[in-house]
Amino acid sequence: GFLAHTDAQIKRILDCLNETGCADNTLVIYITGDNGASAEGTVHGAWSAPSFQNGVHEDPEWLLEHIDDFGTNKCENHFNVGWAWALDAPFQWMKQVASHFGGTRNAMVMKWPDRITEVNSVRNQFHHVIDIAPTILAAAGLKWPETVNGIEQMPVDGVSMEYSFNDADALSTRKTQYFEIFGNRAIFHEGWIASCFHGRVPWIRLKGYEFGGDQEKWELYNIDKDFSQSEDLSDTYPEKLSELQNLFDSEAVKNNVFPLRDTSLRISGNFRVPSALGKRKRMSYTTAHVRIPESAVINIKNASHRISSKVTIPSGGAQGVIACQGGNMSGWSLYLDNHGIPTYHYNCFGQYLTTIRAEDPLVDGDHEITIDYQHDGGFGAGGLATLYVDGESVNSDRIERTVPIIFSMSGETFDVGIDTGAPVGPYPHGYPFSGEIHEVVLERMSRRDRETRKKMKDGFKQAGLRSQ
């Protein structure tokens, strides 16, 4: 599984350091994660991660029928909330909940034989990921640059951990650190931490709360004595809690944390990153466009659209992917099969598959291959897809349901001339196009009127509120 693969790759790096004689003078910093375990897999878990990311959840009975797929390349599974909570023990909460260590704390191992002589020993000093870069620079004897290419750099808040390499009892040089994600917030200061859970559990995406509401309660912990935040001391030391709350406010102002955002509430404002595409509805792509993130490609979901391509087939025929987006759990692909026959494949959550194929392979010469999709209207609804070759309709079929929000949050992309990720369709990995691709055009055809936008808005909201 994932852990075994990770261990094997780390071993390759360490073996290389040993083989090249660099191991003793190399500082290795191994951090076991980037946050707590994810509870986004919902109450029952998921066979297809894109399904719950789009607000669709498999029934427990269906999951049990497909239990043998878990951990294989047949699915993109995600464990359930209970496992996330267990994996974060002994801490409270999990990923997204930055107010508590279950959401933020990970183990870290350091190795540097030439400089760290107290091997196999534990360090209890409090530190944060922002202290990694200063530690590396200090170890290398370098100063943080004040300018880069003439551009003044922001000040560095991190501190080096080098002082602790050979002194397990040294006092921590990290005195204060704030935390905040989705309104879940905390402040650490000299052995104490004040924590405020904002109210939304991670497995319900869009249930928002106002700040300062009854669902919020600030808690207080002395982590020098209470590593796992198990004893709330807010009623015992109200003055200390008030002191830390004020400190959080000052740190939040200094570090641009305010205004706090609950992205599920309209009242918190629109903090979405502006689209690089603006209001464009049509874009042209070439084989130079591979590994393009989904957000940087024309969004054709929940709308009628057209995917057209101009290709040249060499003597003897061709095969391979013309263009695709997504992966084996959700996406679409326009390609020539191993017989050179134009084919369109639509994949919804790895479960609802539609393949539209022409009857004849393409002969050598120039051709235009187009898929025209007419959307029924509404959030994740279906529609009629028609495949055209050189302007002539060669086949059509209904796609009964479509992906409404996102094809992938796992690194799948838009590609022209190859499928760089997990194959969207029933073809080999990669499957490069063996002819010449001159152009691929994505065009969103239908104008989203007020009623359509309302259906989409309601669909997004309901998808985000579903927890199981």
Model-derived features: where do they sit?
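Extracellular glycan-associated modules
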Residues: 259-468
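Secretory-pathway/luminal and periplasmic proteins that interact with or process carbohydrate-rich
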Residues: 35-42, 167-174, 393-397
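C-terminal, low-complexity/hydrophilic appendages and adjacent surface loops
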Residues: 86-106, 179-234, 240, 333, ...
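Active-site rim elements
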Residues: 1, 93-97, 116-127, 144-152, ...
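Short, solvent-exposed loop/turn and secondary-structure capping segments
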Residues: 14, 25-27, 38-53, 119-120, ...
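Substrate-binding rim/cap in mid-to-C-terminal beta-strand-loop elements of soluble/periplasmic
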Residues: 15, 50, 54-170, 216, ...
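Loop/turn elements at helix/coil->beta-strand transitions in domains of secreted/extracellular proteins
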Residues: 22-28, 172-174, 189-192, 240
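Metal-dependent active-site segment of extracytoplasmic phospho-/sulfohydrolases and closely related
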Residues: 5-43, 69, 85, 90, ...
